[in-house]
């Protein structure tokens, strides 16, 4: 007899009614009396458990009664429909075999644990209800990302994790080296001689796959990357991590408005896909984590995203009469409190803010005709703030070189990026979606550490 999955039994319960089934999984709960008992078992294929009924007709009844939570078992028995009971069906056990025991000190007992505590046992937390739901949604959302772009003929590109350039020009990068840290080689100036390093130059973990993706967009037209990125920011907040995943599409022959249209369509697609394919998990989040989650998500997919310029946003904030922790004036980088005021109180829906001052944006963003702003846009969503940032890219070689000089960037480090502008350049646009922030928005989970399997943050690289 082949094993069935818990998911199969839930989705096709009527087909299994009255049949013999075989199921392997982990004990979630167990309670037993002198002559019968109940086990809730889960095999990881579905959010909900299945109840197993066992009695003293089994030769190993006493042994079964002493099973410990998280023990691994295999159950054989009749699948019985119970439409009038609390649970819609159960398995009447004819044979229960212990596959692997669990110690009495198993940390996840049947009670509610804080998210902080569960972070300390990240190797076990996928077994909890909350994180079973989180990581199932994360998996489905990742699949939805690929599905969205593949259905639209985007080419998936794997960009390097080790790079010699800084896509953001911010310098907050993790260095990669094999040099002897106690006695590194020095050059004539007394500085570390990176020509003796593994790559023959200074190398870092990537902060973005964008620059590499642009090279492919100018060959395949529409491409996307989806992979880990790294930022050495000492930001000990609920929204920042040192290692996180980014979705970065790049589109040739595309202006800023094309990026906005694609990003809006993508966000709605991901939400709809997850809502449709993880109804039990999403119901759990709406009931246990964020009681307004469904209303917020339905509002997103049924709304036309707002679009205003940065200048208009600043004007709204200045006239609001609101006392912000960070004062508002033209030229500042909008803070989360400003973003959430715009989305939560003014527009009450997702909002694109466009045309930011060039001095607070990256070197590769296309400068507008006013020479003060760039063709950039961030997507702000209610309850969170920014989840997407992007721009039309600067395709004019002379303008790009001048901008790099203004920011004291070494053009030699970007020679290949500049060369793209010499051989068949065209307007092109792209954006980056922080995947973890999207998962936070989908689930109502408020801390980025709780939507990534093993979070890497300032001062923490456990597991």
Curated annotation (Swiss-Prot):
Compartments in which it is found: Cytoplasm
- Which InterPro entries does the UniProt record give? Aa-tRNA-synt_II, aa-tRNA-synth_II, aa-tRNA-synth_II/BPL/LPL, Asn-tRNA-ligase, Asp/Asn-tRNA-synth_IIb, NA-bd_OB-fold, NA-bd_OB_tRNA
Q: What is its EC number?
A: 6.1.1.22
Q: What class of enzyme is it?
A: ligase
Alphabetic keyword roster: Aminoacyl-tRNA synthetase, ATP-binding, Cytoplasm, Ligase, Nucleotide-binding, Protein biosynthesis
Q: Which GO terms describe its biological process?
A: asparaginyl-tRNA aminoacylation
Q: What GO molecular function annotations does the UniProt record carry, in alphabetical order?
A: asparagine-tRNA ligase activity; ATP binding; catalytic activity, acting on a protein; nucleic acid binding; transferase activity
Taking the first listed entry, what is the main subcellular location of this protein, grouped into a coarse class? cytoplasm
Q: Name a GO CC annotation attached to this entry.
A: cytoplasm
Hey, what's the signal peptide range on this chain? none
Q: Per the UniProt record, which residue ranges are transmembrane?
A: none
Reaction(s) catalysed (UniProt annotation)? tRNA(Asn) + L-asparagine + ATP = L-asparaginyl-tRNA(Asn) + AMP + diphosphate + H(+)
Subunit structure comment from the entry = Homodimer.
Provide the family line.
Belongs to the class-II aminoacyl-tRNA synthetase family.
What's the protein name? Asparagine--tRNA ligase
Q: What is the lineage of its organism?
A: Bacteria, Bacillati, Bacillota, Clostridia, Eubacteriales
Name of the coding gene: asnS
